[in-house]
Amino acid sequence: MSKSLKSLLSFVIYVAVLLSIVYFTPKILAAVLGTPYPIAAITSSSMWPALKQGDLVLIKNVKQNQLKIGDIIVYKNEQGFTIHRIVRLNKENLITKGDANNVEDKPVDYKEVI
């Protein structure tokens, strides 16, 4: 086999492995962490200094009875998703707040927590 053909074959294998990693990593993480959304990017500074804009976070599924005050959660809302800290737990919902925010968020139903 010629040197250029070996180089081409090596490149094709490298690209195939790289594409496999990019494609399968989120699927593997979703299965291991028990959530359809295993990775999220922080897009605002509302959780500063704990989480900075541009940080990537892994999301793990937890049961409602495992949630506690101080946990950082991800929940669905009208704008998409929010990552904030739990400040109060109620029977029917919970209250969150960004660490850098002055006011609490509106109540979040437990079914909205990712």
Language model: regions and residue ranges:
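Extended, hydrophilic extramembrane loops/domains of integral membrane proteins
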Residues: 83-114
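Protein maturation boundaries and topogenic segments
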Residues: 1-56, 60-63
